[in-house]
C-alpha cells in the first residue's frame, strides 16, 4: 500500500465514525508531517511518515478519537524529531494540537530505569498525571503499539528493553483506561521478545487447536445462553480465545505446563435486567 493509499484509508476510517471531521485540517497535518519527516527513514528502511500514519490509524480505528487527536497523532513526532517547533505547530494548526504533540514528546523523553513495583506504580501515575489532556496518553499508547508491531527491525537489546517497558508501564495503563484489546496486544508483543520460545510454543498450540477451541467455545456459549434464557435473564454472552500472554501468565502462576492448561476460552456475561 502506498503512502497516499494509507492516508486515504485513514480518511475512510475517520469518515466511518465521524463524517463531520475536519478533513481539510487532517490532510494539512499529514502533508506537514510528510514534509517534516521527508529525509527520515524507519529502521525497516521505510519512509518515516509510515509511522505517524499508522499511529493515526490506531487512534482512529481502535479509539475513534476526534479530529484534533488524528491531527496530533500525525504530528506527534515533529517537535521531537524534526526542526518544527511548538510555536509553528500552534500557529499552523492550533494551540491545543501543539500542546498534544508537546505532551507526547514529553512522555517520550522519560527514562524508565526502575523495576521496583511501588516505583513502577508511581511512574504509571506520573505518566497519566503529566497528560493534562487524556488524549496525550492515548496517542502515546498508540505510538507504542505501532512501535511494538514493528519491533523486529530493532536490535535484540532494544527489543527486550522496549518490551519490558511496555509490559510494566503501557499495558497496565491501557488496562486502567479500559483499552482491553490494545492491552492484550501490547502484552502479547512484549512476550514475543521477552520469552520468544514460550511465546512461539503457545501460539503454535493455539493455531493447531484453533478449530477445536472454536467449537468448544461455541458449545459452552450455547449452554450458558440457554440456561440464562430459562432464568428469564436478558443478557449477552461473549466468548473469546484467551490471548498468549494470559495463558503464559496462568502457566507461570499455577506452575503448569501448556498441556495442563485446559481453559483457553474466556466468557463475559453482560446482564441487562431480569424479566
Role assignments for model-derived ranges:
Residues 72, 76:
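N-terminal glycine-rich flavin-associated loop
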Residues 98-101, 107-113:
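Active-site-proximal helix-loop-helix substrate-binding element of RNase H-like nuclease domains
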Residues 77, 88-103:
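Hydrophobic or amphipathic alpha-helical targeting/insertion segments
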Residues 31, 57, 99-102:
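Generic alpha-helical structural context detector
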Residues 1-20, 34-40, 49-62, 66, ...:
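Nucleic-acid processing machinery
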Amino acid at each position: 500500500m502506498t503512502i497516499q493509499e494509507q492516508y486515504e484509508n485513514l480518511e475512510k476510517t475517520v469518515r466511518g465514525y465521524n463524517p463531520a471531521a475536519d478533513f481539510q485540517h487532517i490532510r494539512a497535518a499529514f502533508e506537514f508531517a510528510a514534509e517534516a519527516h521527508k529525509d527520515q527513514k524507519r529502521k525497516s528502511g521505510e519512509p518515516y511518515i509510515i509511522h505517524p500514519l499508522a499511529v493515526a490509524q490506531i487512534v482512529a480505528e481502535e479509539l475513534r478519537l476526534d479530529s484534533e487527536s488524528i491531527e496530533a497523532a500525525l504530528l506527534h513526532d515533529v517537535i521531537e524529531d524534526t526542526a518544527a517547533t511548538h510555536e509553528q505547530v500552534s500557529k499552523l494548526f492550533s494551540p491545543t494540537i501543539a500542546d498534544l504533540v508537546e505532551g507526547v514528546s514529553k512522555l517520550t523523553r522519560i527514562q524508565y530505569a526502575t523495576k521496583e513495583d511501588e516505583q513502577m506504580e508511581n511512574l504509571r501515575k506520573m505518566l497519566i498525571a503529566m497528560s493534562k489532556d487524556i488524549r496525550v496518553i492515548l496517542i502515546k499508547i498508540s505510538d507504542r503499539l505501532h512501535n511494538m508491531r514493528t519491533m523486529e527491525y530493532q536490535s535484540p537489546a532494544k527489543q527486550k528493553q522496549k518490551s519490558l517497558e511496555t509490559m510494566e508501564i503501557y499495558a497496565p495503563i491501557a488496562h486502567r483506561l479500559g483499552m482491553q484489546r490494545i492491552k492484550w496486544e501490547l502484552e502479547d508483543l512484549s512476550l514475543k521478545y521477552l520469552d520468544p520460545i514460550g511465546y512461539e510454543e503457545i501460539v503454535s498450540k493455539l493455531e493447531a487447536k484453533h478449530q477445536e477451541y472454536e467449537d468448544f467455545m461455541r458449545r459452552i456459549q450455547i449452554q450458558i445462553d440457554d440456561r440464562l434464557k430459562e432464568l428469564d435473564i436478558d443478557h449477552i454472552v461473549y466468548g473469546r480465545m484467551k490471548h498468549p500472554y494470559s495463558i503464559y501468565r496462568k502457566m507461570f502462576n499455577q506452575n503448569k505446563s501448556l498441556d495442563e492448561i485446559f481453559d483457553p476460552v474466556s466468557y463475559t456475561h453482560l446482564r441487562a435486567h431480569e424479566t
